[in-house]
Amino acid sequence: MDEEIDTRKINNSFLRDHNYATEADIISTVEFNPTGELLATGDKGGRVVVFQREQESKSQPHRRGEYNVYSTFQSHEPEFDYLKSLEIEEKINKIRWLPRQNAAYFPLSTNDKTVKLWKISERDKRPEGYNLKDEEGRIRDPTTITTLRVPVLRPMDLMVEATPRRIFSNAHTYHINSISVNSDYETYMSTDDLRINLWNLEITNRSFNIVDIKPANMEELTEVITAAEFHPNQCNTFVYSSSKGSIRLCDMRTSALCDNHSKLFEEPEDPSNRSFFSEIISSISDVKFSHSGRYLMTRDYLTVKVWDINMESKPLETYQVHDYLRSKLCSLYENDCIFDKFECVWNGTDSVLMTGSYNNFFRMFDRNTKRDVTLEASRENSKPRAILKPRKVCIGGKRRKDEISVDSLDFSKKILHTAWHPNENIIAVAATNNLYIFQDKVN
């Protein structure tokens, strides 16, 4: 990341775009695979679209950062729970990738109730010359077979297939909000509002409940789990966040049921800032370990915070994402925007944070220089390979030509889901039904 973050040049291209978005087309999750060669999106229609990065060519070196559609498949279908008389949406809540072990790719996808492990593989050859079947696959008349043939493989057009390998279901009473693959690559956890389950990737009919915060009397319920993630290299450690603004770090070596946390990260509330909305805006919508495992990043409604896992008392850093909305919390409560769940991501070196905002704005914070920038992902000012200009929001009556008034912000345009390439300065931003890819300008 360049030090001059607010003047850095960024190329962009949008890959998936419709003039008129239907509810099913709205992107609900974005995730790079561990190498960054693939990028997956899930939408409210239960579909997963996988993009593959262009291979570098000497004739067109500028195309190296571009991603093209690699595979599209229907991951989840709408279902109905007849016992509870509830519809189960097909919306993809999260996608996570397993590290590549062979020629195939293995993503995990989940809706509210069911997690699926998919295998994405390529075929560029097909068998020919069977003895008992013709080329169309029909059984041949044995009386017409006069010679014994040896089947051979013939080249064919490349075909990418997505097939479900495992289906993990019937383990969650409440809606799944996150999944996280363990660093042992043998297990993963799925999290709903009140419980966290640990699964073995090879076993679909049994999971272990490792966190259960459901009270005996549901009237005594005071908080719910909002997100959870495994430590990047300690397979026994994970964290989960709550709607009360706390983060709990748990060690599975201490007990099978991790209801008693090892560490509790919580910032004391400032009594002078106490208001009707305090509890709502302090709810954590996302928690992410840094790649090094030393830090935690959390996102609440107005801020991004960085925590040192060795210091529980207060965050190491606090970044204001859109503090200008503090005076508008009442109207944001009335239109339900105050309950929006924004995600946050680290760059590959843990030096820059990124998260979304309204009006199709997204924010970047450089931890080293303490500089920040607001950028916009929109069709109006984003043509392929265009350079993004920083945007500014003003609160007062007077505003400059390049500024936008807080009263002019479009709260229906919001960036909730973002992803950062694990090794390079390439980011993916989901704006309603559009997917934008941005990268540092090379020349």
From Swiss-Prot:
WD repeats: 22-61, 87-128, 171-209, 220-260, 279-317, 334-375, 410-443
Record SUPFAM superfamilies: WD40 repeat-like
Subcellular localization(s) per the UniProt record: Cytoplasm; Cytoplasm, Cytoskeleton; Membrane
Gene Ontology CC: one annotated term: cytoplasm
Membrane found in the keyword field: yes
UniProt similarity note: Belongs to the phosphatase 2A regulatory subunit B family.
Protein name: Serine/threonine-protein phosphatase 2A 55 kDa regulatory subunit B beta isoform
Source organism: Carassius auratus
Taxon lineage: Eukaryota, Metazoa, Chordata, Craniata, Vertebrata
